[in-house]
Amino acid sequence: MANSIYNLAQADALPLESGNSILFPPLYDIVWSLIPFLIILIVFWKLVLPKFQEVLTEREDRIKGGIQRAEAAQAEAKAALEKYNAQLAEARTEAAEIREQARERGKQIEAELKDKANEESNRIIESGSKQLLAQREQVVNELRREMGQNSINLAEHLLGDQLSDNVKRSGTIDRFLADLDTVAPNGK
């Protein structure tokens, strides 16, 4: 064991004795290490870095394009919303106009129906009045005939004589009815 410790101690002492440092390798190591490093650096610089830049540029363009498309879509949506709101306002205005026209038309129809009803009512009243006057005239004429006949019958009964002369009879009846009309003016 002592021998192995001695060997380790000698190994540590060897690099220091030869003048080589652990921190500073020999020049040939540095040159041979720089050559693969430079080759890798050139390959990286010529092949990997341009592809990486291309991917980054493409991604940046895609992001910018996406933002522009999103802004365009947002502007289009905003324009569509404004158009929709304008159409909605126009539809509401049109609906209000239609309601107002319907109200006015309803009032016109109501007025027309009232006028027609009044005309029909007046026509019915006038027709009823004409019928009533005609019936009244008919009743008055019937009553005159009946009264004439009753007065002749009464006169015959009172006189005890039969009044056979039509001319006398009609003259007597006409005088009686004329007297009756003067007593009750307008046939009332």
From Swiss-Prot:
The keyword 4Fe-4S does not apply. SUPFAM superfamilies: F1F0 ATP synthase subunit B, membrane domain. It is a single-pass membrane protein. Its main location: membrane. Keywords: ATP synthesis, Cell membrane, CF(0), Hydrogen ion transport, Ion transport, Membrane, Transmembrane, Transmembrane helix, Transport. One of its GO terms (cellular component) is proton-transporting ATP synthase complex. GO terms for molecular function: proton-transporting ATP synthase activity, rotational mechanism; proton-transporting ATPase activity, rotational mechanism. It is found in: Cell membrane. Coiled coil: none annotated. It comes from the Bacteria. Belongs to the ATPase B chain family. F(1)F(0) ATP synthase produces ATP from ADP in the presence of a proton or sodium gradient. F-type ATPases consist of two structural domains, F(1) containing the extramembraneous catalytic core and F(0) containing the membrane proton channel, linked together by a central stalk and a peripheral stalk. During catalysis, ATP synthesis in the catalytic domain of F(1) is coupled via a rotary mechanism of the central stalk subunits to proton translocation. This is ATP synthase subunit b. It comes from Corynebacterium glutamicum (strain ATCC 13032 / DSM 20300 / JCM 1318 / BCRC 11384 / CCUG 27702 / LMG 3730 / NBRC 12168 / NCIMB 10025 / NRRL B-2784 / 534). The lineage of its organism: Bacteria, Bacillati, Actinomycetota, Actinomycetes, Mycobacteriales.
